[in-house]
Structures are given as structure tokens and as C-alpha cells.
């Protein structure tokens, strides 16, 4: 395609021909192999320069058909529970397998031990309950800590350090538990903290002193320290130098292996959602377009966060001559992607392409209101496209009851 829109979320579309675009069904997710590889190269560079290990947080990107593209660059996978841990073991069997869960189930823990190498607990109680079994199975055991230092602004739903947070152990909680169970520290091989969300390394640089103030006395006994996720390392303006200084400084000071587990950084700007305009209408002064994709079903973070995703060749409201409010076909009044402006009025049949749609999309979508799931395609580095998954009525029905 000849691109007038040079923003990073659409850079990979230069490899896509107009004919290939026209042949795609809609709605569909299109995953960009070249952009995934480019992100992997950046993350591998950080690992090579610092000696840290960077994991793929599968909660953000779980499209395992593309794991072979990322495999040369990642140290392993990070899971949030049994199924993600199993996926990582099945698809990347030679890589490290880490798992953190806010609370593990007793009836699943034995199976989890078959997949995970590192198991991180959320509370001293869970550490005491499951830690001995994990150690006996030869696993590396960690505890997620809460440094009680917030760096979030504008989307507190993603702030693990908010008052009353259920995520991570505070120092007061740890001290109380260790006083009752003096052998608890002996179970630990490492500490884990996850406090960031789509942030630059300056937030990490201010978080580390807070972590040290709360838990620095424990670090000399640890083998590793996991910096968690939320590091937007592959964003064009990300400050790599500060990140690498934080990593090397921590490793040298405490003699620990540093891990990072970003999700978005691996697949940032590496996917698109292609959709078709089904209808246009006007309500008062507002021009509306109904698409065959749904914000509520296919891009739920648009509503949950909320945020307005980038759209190819579109501007801010009023920036270009024709402004439209884009929404989905469901019955939810709030199923709205946002307001965008265009050089010409939208018409039925127009194709639109949302950018940065590889992350928190396929792994979070749903079939509310009977909405079909978008197909998943890949854009190969040579410009060809290939279907990875097609969905239909049975995918909707059999989530709701017995197959018959």
C-alpha cells in the first residue's frame, strides 16, 4: 500500500498490497510478522547489553502461531495461571516458563508444577501453602511485593499500588507473616513487582528506590528480581538508556538476575483490525457510521481503559472536513470506538483499518450479543497474507452450553 499515514501503528502496512487488503474478510485481525520481529530485535538488544532476561507476558499477546517469530528473541513466557502456563510450555518447550497468579487453586497446582519453572505467589499465606510443594518439585519460588508507590495517572484501574490493592504483598503484611512463620523467607528465591502500565523508564527509575526502601534488606538473599511488565520498551520514544541503567545497577548492587515481563512491548504496533462500514446516519449534528466490528466485543480495552485507538488516514474530530462517530452493531448504547475525521464522508462499504491491534484484542474478545469473532490472519514479511483462525456460529454457541 502507498501510505500517506506514516504513524508507527501503520508502518507495517507498506508491505500489504491493495489486492491483499481487498481479499481480507471483515472484521479480521491482521498480525504483522515484520513488526513482531522488529520488536523482538529491540528487546534482544536490551538483553544482550545488560544480561537481563525478558519474558513474553501472554496476557497481552497469546497468538501462538507467531511464537516462532518471537522465539529467537525471548527468554521465556510469563503466565497468569494454569492455561497460559501450559500454552507456553506446549508452544515454547525450550524456554523458561514463569507464572504469577493472585491465588492458586489446590486442584490445579500439581498440574501447574508440570509446566512452570518459576512460580510467584501473591501473598505470604499462598507462599506458605504451596511454596514447599513448589520447592520440592525443583521450582524457583518468588513473592510478588507491593512497594506502595503509584506512578499511574488517568487509568487507576491498572494501578497495582492503589490503596486497597489485592495485588502484591506490602511490607507490613510480610513482617506480620514472617513473625508468625520464621522459616517463610527460606522458601524465597526471588521477588517480583509489577507497578507500571504502558510507561517509560523514568517511572521505573523512581519506583526502584521505593522498592529498596521497603524490601531492600531482602534483596541480598535473592537469586533474581522480576521488574514485572508495563515497560513500553519498543515505543519509538522510549528511553532505553535509563532502563538499561536500572537493570545493570540493580544486578551489580544485589547480585541478582533481573527479569522483565512486558506484554505490549513484544507486539506493539504489530497488528491491525480491518473493518467495513455497514451504514451511515445522522443524529442532530452528529454523523455516525456503524461498523462490522464492535468496541465492546473486539476491542474491549477501548471501553475499559478507556482509549481511542489509532485509525489509518483519520484525524482528530474537526481536524479533517468530515467527522464521524464510529460504533458497533450491538445493542449496547456505549459500543462506540470514538470520533474521527476524514477527508471525505464515509459511505457504506468503506474499509477502515485500526492500528496497534495485536495487543489485548484476540486474548480478550467475546461474543456478546451474538457478535461473530473476527478471523485472525497474518501479514508475512514478504507481503502475503494467510488465515490462522476462522470463527463461526459454533464458537458462539458452545461457550454457552453442551455441544449437540
Describe the role of every protein-language-model region.
Residues 5-104, 108, 294, 342-355, ...:
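N-terminal capping/small domains of soluble enzymes
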Residues 18-24, 190-194, 228:
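A short small-residue
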Residues 49-224, 246-249:
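Active-site-proximal beta-alpha core segment in soluble small-molecule metabolic enzymes
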Residues 149-151, 197, 233, 266, ...:
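Feature marks short, surface-exposed loop/turn motifs that line or immediately flank catalytic pockets
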Residues 194-196, 225-234, 262-265:
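Glycine-rich beta-strand-to-loop/alpha-helix junction loops that act as flexible
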Residues 205-210, 239-245, 275, 341:
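Charged helix-capping and loop-helix junction motifs
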Residues 246, 257-404:
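Charged (often Lys/Glu-rich) extended helix/loop segments that serve as interaction or gating elements
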Amino acid at each position: 500500500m502507498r501510505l500517506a499515514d506514516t504513524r508507527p501503528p501503520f508502518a507495517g502496512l507498506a508491505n500489504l498490497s491493495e489486492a491483499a487488503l481487498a481479499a481480507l474478510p471483515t472484521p479480521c485481525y491482521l498480525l504483522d510478522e515484520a513488526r513482531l520481529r522488529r520488536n523482538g530485535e529491540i528487546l534482544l538488544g536490551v538483553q544482550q547489553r545488560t544480561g537481563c532476561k525478558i519474558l513474553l507476558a501472554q496476557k497481552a499477546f497469546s497468538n501462538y502461531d507467531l511464537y516462532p517469530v518471537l522465539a529467537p528473541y525471548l527468554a521465556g513466557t510469563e503466565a497468569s495461571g494454569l492455561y497460559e502456563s501450559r500454552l507456553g510450555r506446549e508452544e515454547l518447550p525450550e524456554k523458561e516458563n514463569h507464572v504469577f497468579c493472585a491465588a492458586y487453586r489446590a486442584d490445579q497446582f500439581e498440574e501447574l508444577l508440570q509446566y512452570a519453572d518459576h512460580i510467584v505467589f501473591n501473598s505470604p499465606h499462598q507462599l506458605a501453602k504451596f511454596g514447599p510443594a513448589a520447592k520440592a518439585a525443583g521450582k524457583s519460588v518468588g513473592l510478588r511485593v507491593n512497594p506502595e508507590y503509584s506512578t499511574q495517572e488517568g487509568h487507576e484501574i491498572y494501578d497495582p499500588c492503589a490503596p486497597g490493592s489485592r495485588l502484591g504483598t506490602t511490607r507490613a503484611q510480610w513482617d506480620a507473616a514472617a513473625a508468625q512463620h520464621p522459616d517463610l523467607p527460606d522458601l524465597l528465591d526471588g521477588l517480583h513487582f509489577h507497578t507500571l502500565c504502558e510507561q517509560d523508564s523514568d517511572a521505573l527509575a523512581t519506583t526502584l528506590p521505593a522498592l529498596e526502601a521497603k524490601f531492600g534488606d531482602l534483596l541480598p538473599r535473592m537469586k533474581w528480581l522480576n521488574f514485572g511488565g508495563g515497560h513500553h520498551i519498543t515505543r519509538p520514544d522510549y528511553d532505553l538508556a535509563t532502563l538499561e541503567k536500572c537493570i545493570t545497577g540493580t544486578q551489580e548492587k544485589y547480585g541478582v538476575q533481573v527479569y522483565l515481563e512486558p506484554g505490549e512491548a513484544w507486539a506493539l504496533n504489530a497488528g491491525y483490525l480491518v473493518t467495513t462500514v455497514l451504514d451511515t446516519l445522522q443524529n442532530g449534528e452528529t454523523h455516525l457510521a456503524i461498523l462490522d466490528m464492535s468496541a465492546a466485543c473486539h476491542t474491549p480495552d477501548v471501553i475499559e481503559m478507556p482509549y481511542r485507538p489509532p485509525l489509518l488516514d483519520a484525524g482528530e474530530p474537526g481536524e479533517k472536513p468530515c467527522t464521524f462517530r464510529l460504533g458497533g452493531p450491538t445493542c449496547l448504547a456505549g459500543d462506540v470506538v470514538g470520533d474521527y475525521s476524514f477527508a471525505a464522508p464515509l459511505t457504506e462499504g468503506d474499509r477502515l483499518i485500526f492500528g496497534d491491534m495485536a495487543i489485548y484484542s484476540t486474548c480478550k474478545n467475546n461474543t456478546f450479543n451474538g457478535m461473530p469473532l473476527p478471523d485472525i490472519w497474518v501479514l508475512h514479511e514478504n507481503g502475503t497474507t494467510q488465515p490462522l483462525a476462522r470463527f463461526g456460529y459454533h464458537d458462539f454457541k458452545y461457550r454457552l452450553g453442551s455441544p449437540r
